[in-house]
Amino acid sequence: KDGISEEYYENGQLKLREVWANQVKDGLEEIYYVTGQLQHRVTWQGGYKNGTEEKFYANGQPELTGTWALKTKNGPWAEFRENGQLVLTGVYRGGQKQGRWKEYYPNSQLKNNSMFDKDKKQGLFLAYYRNGKLSMKGNYTADKRSGKWEFHRESGAFDRVEIFDDN
């Protein structure tokens, strides 16, 4: 295949538009719902995703936004619920989670706040109940709980401390 390729639904609406060069995807790819609403958009380079990727729900709300660097997730990444609320946000470097990642409950309250280094939890971790009260607080070292961890009840009251030692 070379050039622009298009597919259509039976109702005549555009279903898929993609660009090919030398038998591989190379350029903008767009996929549409039968209603004509954009479902998915991503740029390809030499057969690999490269650049921004966006997915949308049928109602037009974003489902996912992310960045690729030649087939590898690289850059800001966010996932959303159908009502537009954020589910997850963070950054990929070289295909691995790096830095701060946050996950949210359906009520938009922060669920957890994690630090990552090369796809492994590293450093301070905070988890919360749906009501926003702190559930647990501790540190990770190379994806394992380490040191002192504090646990709290849903009321926010302190519950206990546990010590994690990798020995």
Please tell me what each predicted stretch does.
Residues 1-167:
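Glycine/tyrosine- and acidic-biased, solvent-exposed loop/turn segments at the edges of beta-strands
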